[in-house]
Amino acid sequence: MSDPEEERVADSTAHYEEAGKVISIPRPSDEAEGSDVMPEQDDEVQELTTESEENVERHSEFSLSTPKSDDSKPREEVTSLGSASGSQDQDYRLLDYQKGEDDELLFLHKIKAIKETLQTSVRESIATVKIVLIPAGQEIIMPFRVDAPFRFLKEHFAHLLHIPHYVLQITHEGIIVGNNESLIQYGIKPQEIVQVEVFSTLPDQYPVRRIEGLSEGSQIITVTIQTSIDRYEEVAVEIIKSDFHKPFLGGFRHKITGLEYHNAGTQTVPRKIPEKDNLFCRDTQTVFQKKKLQQTTNTTSTQMTKIGVYVSNMTDKLLKPGNYFSAAEYHARRLHAVIVIQTSYRRWHAKRYVESLRKQKKLRLEWEEEQELLKIQEKEEWIRMDYYRRHNPKTTEDFELLYNALELWRQEEVEQICHYSSEAERKAALCELLEKETQMIASIGRHRSAARMERQDAAIQAFLDKCSAPNVWRRGDGKTIEMDTQFTIRARELQSIYKCILLKDLSQDERLDILLTLKHTVKEHECKLTQEILELIDREVDLMMRGVKPHNLEGLRKRITTLFIHYIKTPLFNPEVAKYLKVPQDPLKFYDTIYFCHSCQNYLPSVEFSVSPTSHRVYRCRHCINLENETQRRESFLKYKCLLQRLYYSEADYGDNSQIAFLMQLQDIKYLTENIWASQSALSAWDDLNDLVMVRWDKHVEWSPWNCILLTKDESTAHLRLPSIEKGYGHHFVHKIKHKHILAKNYFSQIPTLASLILNDDEVEDIRSKHSTKSPPKIIITRRIQPH
């Protein structure tokens, strides 16, 4: 082999060795950490780099297969050992190596171009983010990539705040952002400024506090620095805006220019010295004394007036020593000051305390006066209502009150008549008394007939309003939904015709129009009732044409009105009325709710019977019982009814599902009041039933006849405030009350059985909700029909 060939072989070998060394160099760790390449692109670059390294290693192993000892020998020995055939193989091998080297270098240049492109795109995709910590109010400005997920930002601040990252929440413009969302999804472009808020979802357990590492008003900016010839790196730098005044460490001032030259200076805030905790050791508890003279160095000097320097004495002050006082005088002065302060404070505190007592007394007297005024007003209102009931009786209770007053008057008159001396005078007086009583009963009967007619008209109007009302539902939000059906519209049309029939003082033409409308409405159905109505309409029209006066037609018009009411109450002509009839059309529905009255010999529904908890069978209806009371005893149950109503209201307010109280009837409460409690308060013996209430003896136990006490309203309020009955009352009084409870339990022993039988009955719940003062409005939730 010639010398040029040897040189070419040596150069190529050295060149391949150099290429192998360049390719086998691993990627710098700082470059890998500084680059912000996306995960997908980073994986692609890593795969390409791995493949290139494998190819280079394969070629390097093949090219460097000769031992190192051969490389150390002289070049002449290497060429002398080769033959002609060996030189040809080596030429082919060198050509292959040169071709592979060019491909590898081209591949490495592509990888480098991809990295530079990725770094440039990452550098250009950064936005400035202003983070506000809530509620600390600290603002931090830092760069952040627009395509990076928010979870990186959340983890960064979780590390700074020492809070778990899942507790932190980030919002942008009031919208909570997700962990995998980025700024670019919210329309943020690179190089823009955006503000986000960071707060804690558990502020009590993990509060957001200020970051002590960052000073007030600090900002974080990104600075590009050059780390090598063709390599740049971005570094986050914190700008601290602080009003820290650097200490003066000595220096001098130039007299001519006035410039100050300092011996030393600083630009950063000194580190905060951490506070030491309390030490519990010998050094803090033991005093070591040492006698040693020490002269401090004079580090400062006083500038006085001299040549070239003038110091003004305008601000100088002349200090004079005060009067000397001893320690005893000092302590005496302090003691006098303490006495003055305590005296003033005690006087001020006493004035405030007396003023508060005066205000409390004034409020108490005003409250007592208001209560007395309310009681007087209630008494006057009760007397006024009693007077109104006697002169304008409307309800059954009003007529009971009249019959009771009549009976009391009769008994007084009989007592006076019994004092007459002769028998003839007594008989004459009794006959006269009987005649007066008969006249009063007749007067009461006339009032009852008028009241019955008014109630009947009002009941008919209420019945028609109920039938013509649309179906109403209440939604969950409180609003109502109304719906009219063909049946409600039909009922409303019949109601309007009925109201027109009742109108008076109409002209003849208007009356004829109403009758014509009624005739067309009734003619739609043919039956005996409609035929009778049509005949009466034709008769009224005929009489009106003959000039009959209106007051002579009142009976005929009343018959038409009555028959038309029967027409409206017929479900065949008015289907909506079927839901409100007392007697249903299907006999099987009321088969189990019909009872026989042994007094009037009528079959009546169960609501017409008053069943007492102590009764064993249904015997007489309400009407027969009231009739017997009017003819014989003439008792008034109005006061007992009010007492029972107050019991219902008080038990409904407890809300503990009491049962027995709502089973009590008028006869039961009357027996309990008169026979057990003697119609008077158990404490004060007050006998006015209008002021008495029946409350629980033990407020923690359900009301029952054997767990009650009859007291006045004020006494009941004080009784229910007692924490313990045994401590609030004496032993003798408690024994007397328990004896009354035993008597009541023996009489009402059947009530617990009835209460257990109707435990799931809805009627008791309806009564409780009716008398409850805290019951919310009933809400009907509409449900959609499920597809089959």
Curated annotation (Swiss-Prot):
The keyword Cytoplasm belongs to this UniProt entry's keyword annotation: yes
Composition bias, Polar residues: 80-89
Source domain of life: Eukaryota
Matching PROSITE patterns: IQ (PS50096)
UniProt-listed SUPFAM superfamilies: Ubiquitin-like
One GO BP annotation of this record: cilium assembly
Distribution of this protein across tissues and organs: Expressed in the flagellum of sperm cells and cilia of tracheal epithelial cells (at protein level). High expression in testis, also present in brain and lung.
Localization terms from the record: Cytoplasm, Cytoskeleton, Flagellum axoneme; Cell projection, Cilium
Deletion consequences: Leads to an absence of radial spoke 1 (RS1) complex from sperm axonemes. Leads to flagellar bending defects in sperm cells, and consequently abnormal flagellar beating and asthenospermia (reduced sperm motility). Male mice are infertile, no effect on female fertility. Elongated cilia. Increases levels of phosphorylated MAPK1/ERK2 and MAPK3/ERK1.
Domain Ubiquitin-like: 127-203
InterPro entries in the cross-refs: IQUB, Ubiquitin-like_domsf
GO CC, any one term: 9+2 motile cilium
Domain IQ: residue ranges: 334-363
Protein keywords: Cell projection, Cilium, Cilium biogenesis/degradation, Cytoplasm, Cytoskeleton, Flagellum
Record-annotated disulphide pairs: none
Biased composition (Basic and acidic residues): 7-20, 68-78
Bias (Acidic residues): 31-54
Subunit structure and binding partners: Component of the axonemal radial spoke 1 (RS1) complex, at least composed of spoke head proteins RSPH1, RSPH3B, RSPH9 and the cilia-specific component RSPH4A or sperm-specific component RSPH6A, spoke stalk proteins RSPH14, DNAJB13, DYDC1, ROPN1L and NME5, and the anchor protein IQUB. Does not appear to be part of radial spoke complexes 2 or 3 (RS2 or RS3). Interacts with CALM1. Interacts with DNAJB13. Interacts with DYNLL2. Interacts with NME5. Interacts with RSPH3. Interacts with RSPH9. Interacts with ZMYND10.
Role of this protein: Anchors the radial spoke 1 (RS1) complex to the A microtubule of outer doublet microtubules in axonemes. The triple radial spokes (RS1, RS2 and RS3) are required to modulate beating of the sperm flagellum. May play a role in inhibiting signaling via MAPK1/ERK2 and MAPK3/ERK1. Additionally, may play a role in the functioning of cilia. Not required for the functioning of tracheal or ependymal cilia.
Name listed for the protein in its UniProt record: IQ motif and ubiquitin-like domain-containing protein
Record gene name: Iqub
